[in-house]
Structure formats: C-alpha cells, structure tokens
C-alpha cells in the first residue's frame, strides 16, 4: 500500500501557520499566542450601554481552542461582545473556536483593544501580556480604526451569530498553502497526487464549514482565487452578499483622533438598493475655540 511505501508528514497551512512562509510584516505587533481577556472601558465604549467586552488578539496557535473555550465557559455574561484583532494562524483551531462561538450565540466585531497600563508603544511585551493574563477585568480602550481580522482569523469570526465589521476595520482572506515533508525518494507523481488529494480535502472542509456557518459558497470560490502570499480585503458589498455582515447602515462609534489638531470622527456606509454598492459618509468635528466647533 501507498502508506507503507511513503511516510508523509503533512501540514495544511492556512494563513500564518508557517513562520518560514510569512512576510515579516504580516505578524508584526501581534503576540505569538492567542490572548483572551476581559476589558472594561469608558461608558458606551463598545456601544450604547456597553462598557465591557472580551478581547481576543494575537496569532492563533495550535493550543488556542482549548484555552479560549475554557476562558469563555468561565465568563458569567454570555452577551458580552467579542472584539478580534489577529493576523491568523492555525486553521483547525479557528474552526474549533468558531463552532464554540456559534454554540454560544456570540457577537463578534473586529476591533483593537489598547491597555493604557502597558508600556507606551507596545501591547505585546511580557509585562503587558502578564497584565492581560491576570484575573478580572483590565482597564482598556477600544478602537476599530485599522483593526484587522485576516487569514484564519476570518474563519474564527464567522462562527459568531452576530458579526459586525466596522467601516474602518478589515476582514481579509486568502487561499491555503500545503506544505509537507517527504521521507525517502517517492516518485514525483506520487507527491503530486498526494498534494492534490490534500488540497481537495482542504477545500471540502472549508466548504462544509462555511455552509454550517450560513455563509455563501461564493466566499469559498473567492478564497480559491487569492494566492497564499496575498490578502483580499473583503469589500462592504462582499460582506453583505456573502452573508457576513448584513447591516444596511454599518457605522463606527464617535472616536477622538489625536492628531496635531484633534477632532472627533464617525464613518458610516449606507446600502444602496440590493447591496451591490454602499455610500460612504464621514463626519469630522473640530473645535475652533472653547465655545465653537465645526
């Protein structure tokens, strides 16, 4: 039998599992293990009447699912929204976490949590990760601007029952890469056949997963067209058409932009017709003096 002649160790890489294959910038600024913690912000920090949320961030490592499940089972309030900021990682772990989020009927959003108690300029050094790992709530700030959930994180995100991608955050996808180690000297055709079977299996697993999550098969078709080395940022019409975020008027919260001249900002996207296009709207408020704004 084939299995007696050859010994293959195969690893299906979905975005981010193999560090040797990543561009260095892809995971810059992210912890090497998926981190989860309770965060508490200012009143209405995560929406009207919401000041507490669950932060999940960093690379999706191969032990992430058990860790995330254990943490969430201990959270007394199942209605707390989950904010994701991750460059991806292990796809099997993403599937497992997604299925647990679905069973929990979770609300997931793409957002970046910042802990002021951490050293300025970093959120992933050992001291900061220790703060986040401590029991209880962590005082934090929340932002959707430039937050990202890409690669395998997108699968994790799809598990939530309620999914919200703010107009200034990113959900992105790309195809898988198959890597395997060959022991011995098998015929090239045997290697090619093995590769083909594994990729077919990966596509099938993805299709089954997306169908279970209620997502259009069009997303899987799109993923197959995007090379592993690239990322496709899902557009608002795609988010709507694929059934990922079907809100007719997605928007951001009002946020203070700490520029040379600070201002508060809000962005919204309004669905046109059947959702094939969205109208972008942005508001900016500046203070001209202590008594007047514009």
For each of these PLM feature ranges, what is it?
Residues 18-148, 152, 162-172, 177-294:
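N-terminal organellar transit peptides
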């Amino acid at each position: 039998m084939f299995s007696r002649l050859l010994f293959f160790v195969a690893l299906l890489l979905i975005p981010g599992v193999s560090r040797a294959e990543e561009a260095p910038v892809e995971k810059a600024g992210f912890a090497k293990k998926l981190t989860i913690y309770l965060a508490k912000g200012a009143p209405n920090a995560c929406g009207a009447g919401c000041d507490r949320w669950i932060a999940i961030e960093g690379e999706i490592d191969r032990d992430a699912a058990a860790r995330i499940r254990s943490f969430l089972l201990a959270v007394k309030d199942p209605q707390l929204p989950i904010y994701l900021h991750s460059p991806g990682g292990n796809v099997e772990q993403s599937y497992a976490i997604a299925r647990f989020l679905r069973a929990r009927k979770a609300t997931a959003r793409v957002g970046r949590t910042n802990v002021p108690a951490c050293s300025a300029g970093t959120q992933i050094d050992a001291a900061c990760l220790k703060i986040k790992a401590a029991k209880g709530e962590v005082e934090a700030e929340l932002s959707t601007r430039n937050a990202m959930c890409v690669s395998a994180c997108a699968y994790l995100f799809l598990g939530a029952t309620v999914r919200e991608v703010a107009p200034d955050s990113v959900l992105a996808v790309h195809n898988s890469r198959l890597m395997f180690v060959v022991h011995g000297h098998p015929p090239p055709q045997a290697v090619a056949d093995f590769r083909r079977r594994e990729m077919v299996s990966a596509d099938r697993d993805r299709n089954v997963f997306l169908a279970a999550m209620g997502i259009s098969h069009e997303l899987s078709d799109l993923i197959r067209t995007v090379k592993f080395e690239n990322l496709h940022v899902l557009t608002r019409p795609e988010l709507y058409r694929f059934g990922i975020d079907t809100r007719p008027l997605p928007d951001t919260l009002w946020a203070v932009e700490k520029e040379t001249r600070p201002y508060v900002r809000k962005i919204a996207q309004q669905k046109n017709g059947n959702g094939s296009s969205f109208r972008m709207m942005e508001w900016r408020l500046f203070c001209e003096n202590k008594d007047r704004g514009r």
